[in-house]
Amino acid sequence: MVVRIGLYRMVSWVKHQLTARNTGGHGIHSPYLFEWVRMVMSDKNSYYAWRKIEECRNKMLSDNREVEFVDYGSGRVQGESGKVKTGSGDWRKVSDIAKSSLAKKKYAQMLARLVHWLGTSYSPENSSETACGLEFRGLNIVELGTSLGVTTAYLAAVDSRNKVVTYEGCPAVAKIAQANWKSLGINNIECKVGEIDVEKLDKELERVDVAFVDANHTYASTRAYINILFGKMHAKSVLVLDDIHHSAEMERAWREICDDERVTSTMDLYQMGLVFFDKHYWKRHYVMNN
């Protein structure tokens, strides 16, 4: 099954390369999305906080501790218990988890730029009225699939006024993530541990400004998560779905998201898909390199 998924992704990558545009924004007619490409995808500036987060990533990549590992979301072969079978039973090295599950540096930093961009162009949905006018009260950010917390740290470090709620299925991995945030001095993250319950998720979430979904890589679970999140998002929200070409199931889910009447524009970066909801713009799907 692992070999089959690998071949599937290779074919998907070739198809993507044959149709993808560059990241300069050429061919994007929406001023809003053109600005998004310029400020988020094409920006190569780095920030001090990012260096600390990358030091944390490198620490995880060399961490040989073994932890009891439960994975509800990789899409790999599972045993009768629902737990993914790994080469060493239910125990894995932290370094192996880091290698297989952490978002690449460029994508994690792109997500941070996305949060920054939305925060600097905030709207009444995430503002409160004061004597001096509208005052930014922070973004509500949701992450499904915490892993070791590196991407979570990027999402949260942008602005301490933002609130990040992240969901992680494996208690041992969540514990390491929480220790990482503490060492980085990041205090605006709430981590919910355990398998994601869709009904509970629906009750817990209110307004969502940014969502990053990197959880259960099956069609049914992905669609269930997306349906809940769509109901919490507004015109200026952005949803990011990871691993959209991971398998036929994930590609099916991604195609249905692109066709959803609630969605206006989508961007396929191969590794990730981005979803926009502003009804002022024509419905359009972009395939782009990053």
Positions of the model-derived regions?
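A short alpha-helical cap/connector motif
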Residues: 2-212, 216-238, 245-290
